[in-house]
Amino acid sequence: MKFLALLSLVAAATAAPAALEARGATTCGSTSYSASQVTAASNAACNYVQSGTTAGGSTYPHQYRNYEGFYFQGLSGPFYEFPLRTSGVYNGGSPGADRVIITGNCDEAGQITHTGASGSGFVACSGTS
């Protein structure tokens, strides 16, 4: 009986990380990102914002004005955008279409993309409103 209780506890504990990862993953256009890719980009953006520096010779992260009016989980700005990549963390060069958005306090607000947007605007990636 104790063995079954222990087995149930172990099964629940090992299932929890997968559920957390699924919440942080996103899809921007047809490109999917894992939770760890989103977190890595958000952490890099946070480090740059806190140190007042940018990635490589780029302007990222830079302030995002939210002209589109995203809700971003009810978080308050200022917001900062930083490129989201499938291969490693952005360190300069072409930023691609996808971005993570963080607050000045380094809270992860959401993910947005130029893919499917008009002009230079943005649309939400999955999980962002």
Curated annotation (Swiss-Prot):
Enzyme Commission identifier(s): 4.6.1.24
Catalytic residue positions: 62, 81, 114
Protein's UniProt name: Extracellular guanyl-specific ribonuclease ARB_00194
GO molecular function: lyase activity; ribonuclease T1 activity; RNA binding; RNA endonuclease activity
Alphabetized UniProt keyword annotations: Disulfide bond, Endonuclease, Hydrolase, Lyase, Nuclease, Secreted, Signal
Domain of life, source organism: Eukaryota
Cell location: Secreted
Keyword Lyase tagged: yes
Matching Pfam families: Ribonuclease (PF00545)
